[in-house]
Structures are given as C-alpha cells and as structure tokens.
C-alpha cells in the first residue's frame, strides 16, 4: 500500500533510478528551483544533484545548473560520470565502520549482516545503492543538506580500505594484521 501512494512535492523526483545501456545506475537525488530577482522580474533556474554508480564499487556524483530541469539533470549526470571513484566492498557491505563529514554534515556507516538491507536515509541511500552496497547501517547527523551529505558519503566510502590494501601498504600479509 505504501508503494502505491503517490509522492508529492519535492520528494517526487528524489531517488529516481534509471539503468542506461552502459550498465550504470543513475539516481536523481534532488532538484531545486533557484530564483534571481532582476529589473524585469524573477529569473528561475534549476539545479540537479545526481549520483551514478556501476553497482560493483564505483560511484560518482554531479551537480548541474540550467534554465530547464532536464538540461540540469543531463549536465549533472555527465559530471557524475567524470568524477567516478572506486570503493572497496566486502560481499555487498563495508569492510569497517566509517565516520566522515563535509561542512556540517556528518555520516556514520557500519557494516551489516546479510539480509539487513540498506538502512540509510535521503541522499546517503542513493549513494550506497549506486555503489552496490546491499547491507549497511547508516546515520546522518548535523546538516541534512543533500549536497554535503552526498560529498561526505562519497568521501567516507573512498577512504575505506580493505584488509588486503592495508596489508600491502604495511608490507605484511593479511594474516599478520591482527596478530602483530
């Protein structure tokens, strides 16, 4: 029943998902109307925040501005495809707990067991689903500004490292990490 209910207002376009022929998952996070007052009246422009991912560890976000919504979305999708970063995943979840932030937005992400699902809100959910995380517990604190939440989430995910990468950095084997 909840799925059948139509969303109203600005939530209507939030987290809209499309799969394009290149296999990338595109999610529209937010569309905003901006007004500039000039001598002849108001000029309206639109901004779009989108997230693009391959569902297997790559994710990027883009922010586009234009006089019309479709053009703003297209610009932001192009920018998102140019800004892809790699994320180390562990069977559909994270390797370890992640805390990060951008501006006043703070994010906390924790690995979860199989069957948990993506427990995250708003802009964080779009990023986590696009990158291919299937099970995670996440919480946003501080500012809920979608742009800063997306930036903080991508920054935290890209800083996360697998045990194999940490061991290679230290010149050790993975088995030696916990023992000394």
Curated annotation (Swiss-Prot):
Keywords: Ribonucleoprotein, Ribosomal protein, RNA-binding, rRNA-binding
Source taxon at top rank: Bacteria
Residue ranges of domain S5 DRBM in the record: 24-87
PROSITE patterns: RIBOSOMAL_S5, S5_DSRBD
GO molecular function: rRNA binding; structural constituent of ribosome
Pfam assignment, any one: Ribosomal_S5
UniProt record, GO biological process: translation
Gene Ontology cellular component annotations, sorted alphabetically: small ribosomal subunit
InterPro entries attached to this UniProt entry: Ribosomal_Su5_D2-typ_SF, Ribosomal_uS5, Ribosomal_uS5_bac-type, Ribosomal_uS5_C, Ribosomal_uS5_N, Ribosomal_uS5_N_CS, Ribsml_uS5_D2-typ_fold_subgr
Protein's job: With S4 and S12 plays an important role in translational accuracy.
Entry-linked HAMAP family: Ribosomal_uS5_B (MF_01307_B)
Subunit composition and interactions: Part of the 30S ribosomal subunit. Contacts proteins S4 and S8.
Domains as described in the record: The N-terminal domain interacts with the head of the 30S subunit; the C-terminal domain interacts with the body and contacts protein S4. The interaction surface between S4 and S5 is involved in control of translational fidelity.
Family per similarity comment: Belongs to the universal ribosomal protein uS5 family.
Alphabetized NCBIfam families for the sequence: rpsE_bact (TIGR01021)
Protein name: Small ribosomal subunit protein uS5
Species of the source: Stenotrophomonas maltophilia (strain K279a)
């Amino acid at each position: 029943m909840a799925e059948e209910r139509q969303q109203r207002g600005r939530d209507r376009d939030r987290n809209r998902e499309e799969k394009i022929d290149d296999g990338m998952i595109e999610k529209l996070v937010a569309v905003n109307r901006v007004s500039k007052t000039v001598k002849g009246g108001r000029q309206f422009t639109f901004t779009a925040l989108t997230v693009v991912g391959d569902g297997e560890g790559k994710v990027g976000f883009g922010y586009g501005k234009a006089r019309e919504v479709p053009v703003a979305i297209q610009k932001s999708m192009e920018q998102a495809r140019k800004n892809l970063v790699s994320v180390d995943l562990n069977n559909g979840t994270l390797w370890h707990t992640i805390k990060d932030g951008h501006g006043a937005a703070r994010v906390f992400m924790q690995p979860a067991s199989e069957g948990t699902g993506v427990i995250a809100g708003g802009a964080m959910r779009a990023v986590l689903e696009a990158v291919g995380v299937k099970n995670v517990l996440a919480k946003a604190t501080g500012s809920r500004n979608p742009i800063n939440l997306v930036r903080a989430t991508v920054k935290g995910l890209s800083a996360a490292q697998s045990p194999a990468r940490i061991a290679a950095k230290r010149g050790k084997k993975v088995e030696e990490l916990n023992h000394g």
